[in-house]
Swiss-Prot record:
Protein name, entry field: Probable serine protease do-like
Span list, region Serine protease: 116-254
GO biological process, one term: proteolysis
Keyword Ubl conjugation: no
Keywords per UniProt: Disulfide bond, Hydrolase, Protease, Repeat, Serine protease, Signal
Gene that produces this protein: degP
Gene3D superfamilies: 2.30.42.10, 2.40.10.120
Cysteine-cysteine disulfides: 87-99
Residues in coiled coil: none
Superkingdom, natural source: Bacteria
Domain PDZ: 281-372, 387-469
Length: 478
């Protein structure tokens, strides 16, 4: 009886131990399995970033910029120089000495250092894209890769109107280029990752979503068609990459809306399709050679849509067609509403302007036009701009800063000054808005293209015969 009890006790003990061991093993197996599953479903950007980071560069700039300080107290400046009310029209003081006083001081160059970011888009050629404002006025450009390698770089081309610049790393090899997406396929709500070099801290990553597309009216750049994101973009991120979760470039970080200088979750990037078009021209020509449609217009609001009898507020309203422009020759008319470009919907005049602003001369495209209750497709070939801006590195420096257009004066083909930027060579020579250029060096120049060719010959001196109001004057540049 005792033997039976002892044997039974041993059996119970063995079963208990086996059961406990089995439960422990199950727990271990279960915990291990849960750990594996947890790692599998835990989201991480690390694998994607490992591929992308080698293509993002930090940029260090050494440069110099011209600054001006006033010789005169601020309250006295309006009474001296050409802009004085006493020096206008038929004023008896027009030729007095105080009308020829320059209230500004002489130009003064100041050195500066700056930081930014960029993205390698062609590993074989060493091409990287960044913002124009990052490399503007740069005398020396040095870039650093994610692995610590450093290279000197040079500017291939830049465009202030879109804030895009293309640089080339010198004597660089074993580079990694980023894959570029199609920004036309972006949607509000898509995840974004911003990579850059904020505050010189080295490569930093932030994430967010696309908050809006086609943002404009920010007075940041000339051509505005921004991607808006809430991914933090801070100082130094300019020129850096905005990528999707596949690690593909969707935009170039360019600006933030920051009243106090910090990030409030509103950042802007230039769409990569625009970047591709502009940098391709920079590679080919060293600059952007834009075609121009040749229209003036406005956004299509509800009141205008009602008057034009269209059941939509999306499109670009054409208020004027410039003579001899691409639009004029294609048959576009004032009052037309452009609703598509190459079958792609156009949401606003700003978006149309931005789309066309990245296209080169001779580009053929199809515009969808709403006219008198019907939609009409019109083929247009972009021509050279009707209005020419000679403020380019490749133009003669003596006349930089002036906007010119072809003009008819007394039945003679001449050139009209549309605008003069302050503190530029053109303003120092004495050009003023609405001046009419009758001849240059006693040679009749009938249009802007002829003038550009003449300036490219780099004459030792330039003598401009100018009609200004009722006066005929001469402006000289040596």
């Amino acid at each position: 009886m005792k033997k039976s009890a002892i044997i039974l006790s041993k059996i119970i003990l063995i079963l208990t131990l086996l059961l406990s061991f089995g439960m422990s093993w199950n727990n271990v197996f279960s915990n291990t399995k849960n750990s594996i599953v947890s790692r599998e479903i835990s989201p991480s950007l690390a694998p994607m970033l490992e591929k992308v980071m080698p293509s993002v560069i930090s940029i260090n700039i050494e440069g110099s910029a011209i600054t001006r300080t006033s010789r005169l107290p601020h309250q006295f400046q309006p009474f001296f120089g050409d802009n004085s009310p006493f020096c206008q029209g038929n004023s008896p003081f027009r030729h007095s000495p105080f009308c020829h006083i320059n209230p500004d001081s002489d130009d003064k160059k100041e050195k500066f250092r700056a930081l930014g970011s960029g993205v390698i888009i062609n590993a074989d050629k060493g091409y990287a894209v960044t913002n124009n404002h990052v490399v503007e006025n740069a005398n020396k450009i040095q870039v650093q890769l994610s692995d610590g390698r450093r290279y000197e770089a040079r500017v291939i081309g830049k465009d202030s109107r879109s804030d895009i610049a293309l640089i080339q790393l010198k004597n660089a090899n074993n580079l990694s280029e980023i894959k570029i997406a199609d920004s036309d396929n972006l949607r509000v709500g898509d995840y974004t990752v911003a990579i850059g070099n904020p505050y010189g801290l080295g490569e930093t990553v932030t994430s967010g979503i696309i908050s809006a597309l086609g943002r404009s009216g920010l007075n940041i750049e000339h051509y505005e068609n921004f991607i808006q994101t809430d991914a933090a973009i801070n100082r130094g991120n300019s020129g850096g990459a905005l990528v999707n979760l596949k690690g593909e470039l969707i935009g170039i970080n360019t600006a933030i809306l920051a009243p106090d200088g910090g990030n409030i979750g509103i950042g802007f990037a230039i769409p990569c399709n625009m970047v591709k078009n502009l940098t391709a021209q920079m590679v080919q020509f060293g600059q952007v050679r834009r075609g121009e449609l040749g229209i003036m217009g406005m956004e299509l609001n509800s009141d205008l849509a009602q008057i034009m009898k269209i059941n939509s507020q999306k499109g670009a309203f054409v208020s004027r067609v410039l003579p001899n422009s691409s639009a004029f020759e294609a048959g576009i008319k004032a009052g037309d509403i452009i609703i598509s470009l190459n079958r792609k919907p156009i949401s606003s005049f700003s978006s149309l302007r931005a789309e066309i602003g990245s296209l080169p001369v001779a580009t053929k495209m199809e515009l969808g036009v709403f006219r008198e209750g019907r939609i009409k497709n019109i083929t247009v070939e972009l021509k050279h701009s009707v209005k020419h801006n000679l403020n380019s590195e490749n133009d003669y420096i003596g006349i930089e800063g002036v906007d010119l257009s072809d003009y008819i004066f007394n039945e003679q083909k001449v050139i009209k000054v549309d605008n003069v930027k302050p503190h530029t060579p053109a303003s120092k020579i004495g050009f003023k808005k609405d001046d009419i250029i009758l001849n240059v060096n006693q040679k009749l120049i009938s249009n802007v293209d002829e003038l550009k060719k003449f300036l490219h010959s780099k004459p030792k001196i330039l003598v401009f015969n100018i009609k200004r109001g009722n006066d005929t004057i001469y402006l000289v540049s040596e």
